[in-house]
Regions:
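Ser/Thr/Pro/Gly-biased, low-complexity, turn-/loop-rich segments
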Residues: 1-208
C-alpha cells in the first residue's frame, strides 16, 4: 500500500508501518526503487544480527519498497542460543546458520550435527562433522537439531564407604592409581574392613 511517513523515515520505518513482512516475504533482499530504478538492496539481517544500519536508508517522496519472497528457510533447534527459523540466501552454509542462531550453548554437542532435508519423495539425513560446517550449503526446508553432551564423565571416579573423604574425584596426573586415590581420600577410617575393597568399573555400554 501507500503510506505517508515522517521526513526522516527509513526503510525499516516503512516496513514497520506496513505491519512487517508476512510468512513468505524476505528479510534478506528488500529492494528500494527510486526514480523507477532499483536503488538499494537491503538485508535486514545485517541490522538485526549485527546492528549494521548502513542499509537503513532515509526515504524520499515517491520511493517504492518491494518485498519479494524468501529463498530458503531453515530451522535450528536444540542447544543453540536462539533456536528458531532463519532465512538464508545464496550459498550460505551451516556455519552461517549457526551464527544467526547465536552459536552453541555451553552444553551443546559440537563434533557433528544431523541435518534433515526434504527430498523429492522422502526425507534425507546428513551427518555433518564440525570441520565441514563452513562448506555444507543449506537448502530450503533443512532442519538442524543440536543435541546436548552426554550426562556422564570421562575422567571421574567415586569413592564410597569407610574412608575419611568419600566423594567424586577426577582422574589426572596426580590421581592415576588406586594408591593415589586412597591418599586423596585420606585413607580408610578406623572401622574399615581392610582385607577387601570392591572396584566397580563402568563400561561404555554402562554395564559394570
Amino acid at each position: 500500500g501507500t503510506y505517508t511517513l515522517p521526513s526522516l523515515a527509513t526503510v525499516f520505518h516503512a516496513l514497520y508501518s506496513a505491519g512487517g513482512v508476512n510468512q513468505v516475504g524476505t528479510l534478506r533482499d528488500v529492494v528500494l526503487y527510486r526514480n523507477g530504478k532499483a536503488f538499494k538492496h537491503v538485508d535486514v539481517y545485517g541490522y538485526i544480527m549485527n546492528g549494521d544500519n548502513t542499509f537503513d536508508i532515509v526515504l524520499q517522496d515517491g520511493d517504492l519498497i518491494n518485498v519479494g519472497t524468501y529463498e530458503k528457510i531453515v530451522t535450528i533447534l536444540g542447544k543453540v542460543k536462539r533456536p528458531m527459523r532463519y532465512e538464508l540466501k545464496g550459498d550460505e552454509t551451516l556455519s552461517k546458520a549457526l551464527e544467526y542462531a547465536g552459536g552453541f550453548t555451553g552444553d551443546a554437542y559440537k563434533k557433528n550435527l544431523n541435518v534433515t532435508r526434504k527430498g523429492d519423495s522422502e526425507y534425507e539425513m546428513y551427518t555433518v562433522y564440525n570441520e565441514e560446517f563452513p562448506e555444507f550449503v543449506m537448502a530450503n526446508g533443512d532442519s538442524v537439531l543440536v543435541d546436548a553432551i552426554l550426562p556422564r564423565y570421562e575422567n571421574r571416579v567415586s569413592v564410597e564407604g569407610a574412608v575419611f573423604r568419600p566423594g567424586k574425584y577426577a582422574i589426572s596426573a596426580s590421581i592415576a592409581t588406586l594408591k593415589d586415590l586412597l591418599d586423596v581420600v585420606e585413607g580408610p577410617r578406623e572401622d574399615a574392613f581392610l582385607n577387601r575393597a570392591i572396584l566397580y568399573r563402568e563400561r561404555e555400554d554402562l554395564t559394570r
